[in-house]
C-alpha cells in the first residue's frame, strides 16, 4: 500500500511538473495566445477580488462579476457603490482601467 501511494504521488507530481513546464514554455515562447473564456473569467475575478473589492469595501461598497461576453464585462455594484452618484467614475476608473491594465486593453465594463 505504501509503494502504491508513493507511485501515485509521484505520478501526480510528474503530471504537475509537466503542466508547469508547458506553461512556462508557452509564456517564454513570445507567442501571444488568446485567453480562453475560463481563463479570462478567472483573471477578471482575481483582479476584482485582490485589487478592486478591497478599495470598494473600504468605502462601504462592493462589486460582483455578473457575466463576461467577449470583451464586455458585466458587474453589479453593491452597497454604497450601487446608489453612489460617482458609480460611473468607479466603474470606469477603478474597475475598467484596472482590468484593461491587467488583462486586455479592449475590455469594456458595464453595470447591470
UniProtKB/Swiss-Prot annotation:
Record keywords, A-Z? Nitrogen fixation
Q: Does the keyword Cytoplasm apply?
A: no
- What PANTHER family has UniProt attached to this entry? IRON-SULFUR CLUSTER SCAFFOLD PROTEIN NFU-RELATED, NIFU-LIKE PROTEIN 3, CHLOROPLASTIC
Return the similarity comment: Belongs to the NifU family.
What protein is this chain from? Nitrogen fixation protein NifU
Q: Does the entry feature the keyword NADP, yes or no?
A: no
Any Pfam family? NifU
Example GO molecular function term? iron ion binding
Recorded name of the encoding gene: nifU
Which InterPro entries would you find in this protein's record? FSCA_dom_sf, NIF_FeS_clus_asmbl_NifU_C
What's its job? May be involved in the formation or repair of [Fe-S] clusters present in iron-sulfur proteins.
GO terms, biological process:
iron-sulfur cluster assembly; nitrogen fixation
Amino acid at each position: 500500500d505504501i509503494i502504491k501511494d508513493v507511485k501515485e504521488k509521484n505520478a501526480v507530481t510528474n503530471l504537475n511538473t509537466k503542466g508547469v513546464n508547458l506553461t512556462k514554455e508557452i509564456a517564454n515562447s513570445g507567442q501571444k495566445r488568446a485567453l480562453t473564456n475560463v481563463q479570462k473569467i478567472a483573471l477578471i475575478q482575481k483582479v476584482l477580488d485582490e485589487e478592486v473589492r478591497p478599495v470598494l469595501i473600504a468605502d462601504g461598497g462592493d462589486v460582483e462579476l455578473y457575466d463576461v461576453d467577449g470583451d464586455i464585462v458585466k458587474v453589479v455594484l453593491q452597497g454604497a457603490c450601487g446608489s453612489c452618484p460617482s458609480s460611473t467614475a468607479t466603474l470606469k476608473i477603478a474597475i475598467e482601467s484596472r482590468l484593461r491594465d491587467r488583462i486586455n486593453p479592449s475590455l469594456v465594463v458595464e453595470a447591470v
